[in-house]
Design a protein with these regions (language model features):
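Short, exposed beta-strand "edge-strand" segments with a Pro/Gly-rich flavor and a Y/T-containing core
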Residues: 60-66, 85-90
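Cysteine-nucleophile active-site neighborhood
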Residues: 1-63, 69-71, 140, 147-158, ...
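Acyltransferase
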Residues: 81-175
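Short, glycine-/aromatic-enriched active-site segment of Class I SAM-dependent methyltransferases
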Residues: 76-80
Length: 175
């Protein structure tokens, strides 16, 4: 079954993967448990100590570099994208290697390498989780590439034809 996690969905996908696949008991987000033994998601480092509600977010449009050969790169058709953000918490890169060893790959990050923006599972036919908000750039007659690909994957899953992202012959036209 296709999975598409957006913002909080990205955060919980990584936490659940850490808990249930990597076996990290107590893996959590500091938004839920500040004393979690495995802080997979934590408050943005640049915002620690900032109490002004409006000043505690990563807000606006930011560039993201996509990993070569990733599901995301195939969907977007490019290796550099620009997406809009609205969040206070981020993925803790200390867990990147452990998650990757079990099958969850970081496939998009900020150009400075500081922020993880996209996680995916290459062994899964369609599993993409993003920290940003693609809905901010989607329109009824011009859907965002991630939504178009997700809907196509759901259609293919229902009809028993879902294999992997990047299958030619898409019924969904983007652009």
């Amino acid at each position: 079954m296709p999975f598409f996690g957006i913002c909080y969905g990205f955060q919980w996908a990584t936490v659940e993967f850490a808990r249930n696949v990597c076996g990290l008991d107590g893996a959590d987000s500091t938004e839920v448990d500040e004393n979690a033994p495995h802080k997979v998601i934590y408050k943005l480092r640049d915002l620690l100590g900032v109490d002004d509600l409006g000043g505690t977010m990563r807000l606006g449009r930011y560039e993201c570099e996509l990993a070569k050969g990733s599901i995301a790169e195939r969907i977007y058709g490019t290796s550099l994208i620009s997406e809009r953000h609205r969040h206070r918490f981020e993925f803790n890169c200390l867990y990147e290697k452990e998650l990757a060893e079990k099958g969850m790959r970081v496939s998009g990050r900020s150009p400075d390498g500081k922020f993880v923006e996209i996680a995916e599972m290459p062994s899964h036919p369609w599993f993409v989780a993003v920290q940003f908000h693609p809905e901010f750039q989607s329109k009824p007659i011009k859907p965002h590439p991630l939504f178009a690909s997700f809907v196509e994957a759901a259609y293919r899953h229902k009809s028993g034809k879902l294999e992997h992202v990047g299958v030619k012959g898409s019924r969904v036209q983007v652009g």
